[in-house]
Amino acid sequence: NTGHWDVKRVPDSFSKSLENQPLQDTSFSFTDVPNNNAIIDDVEMKKACISMVKDFYDEGIDLDYADGGLKCRCEIASYFYDGVKKNMGIDAELSFETKPTHQLGGYNPLTNKIELNSNYLEKSDCEDLLNTILHESRHAFQNKCIDTPNSVTVKDNIIEVWKDNFDNYIRPDEDFEAYENQEIEKDANYFADSVMKKGTNPYYA
C-alpha cells in the first residue's frame, strides 16, 4: 500500500467526513464487546477485533459491501467501526471526506475524529478500508491511553512514548521515512495489519 495515514499534530487536525445521515439497520451485529467503562485489556481487545474481522468475512459481509451502493457501503463501514469502537472503548466520531488518493485517512486527537478517504467507497474490495479503520482507531486508542492510562493495561512507559510522539508528530509530507518510523505509526500499522491477517486466515484460531 503506497498511501499513508495521517495523524494530525497540534494545532493541525487529521481529516475525514461524509454527510452524516441516519444509518439503517443491517443484518449483522458484533457480539461480545466489552463495556466502555471497563478496563481495556490490550491483548484481549486485539483478539476481539480479530474475531470481529473473521465474523465479517464468514458472514459474507464483504460480498454485501461489494454488491452494495455507496450508501450501503458507508453503512457497513460505519457498523464495522461501531464494533471496533466498542472493543477499544473509544468514542471517536467517524466520517468520510474527499481527499487525495494517497491520503488514506487520519485521526485528530484535538477533535477526537477519524476521517477516511471517501474514495474507498468507490472500490468493491473493502479490505483496505477495514485496515484503515483499524489503523485510525488504534490511534484513537493510543490517545485514550494517554488521557486515561488507568483505563487500559498498556504499560506506562509505552504510553509515555506515545504521548511524546503525539506531541512531536512528524507528518508524511515533512519526512516520510521518519513518519513511518514513529512509534505510534509502527504500532498502528502492526495492529491493523496483524488483525486483518489473522482475521482473514481460515486456519487462525
Where are these regions (language model features)?
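Low-complexity, glycine/serine/proline-rich disordered segments
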Residues: N1-L70, P202-A205
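Hydrophobic residues embedded in beta-strands of well-ordered beta-sheets
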Residues: W5, N112-I114
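Auxiliary, metal-adjacent structural segments of Zn-dependent hydrolase domains
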Residues: D55-L110
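Surface-exposed helix-capping loop/turn segments at secondary-structure junctions
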Residues: D64, K86-I90, D147-P149, K197-A205
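Hydrophobic (often cysteine-bearing) scaffold residues that line and stabilize catalytic clefts
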Residues: G68-A77, C126, L130, E180, ...
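Short pre-active-site segment immediately N-terminal to the catalytic Zn-binding motif
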Residues: E115-T132
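Catalytic Zn2+-binding segment of zinc metalloproteases
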Residues: E136-V154
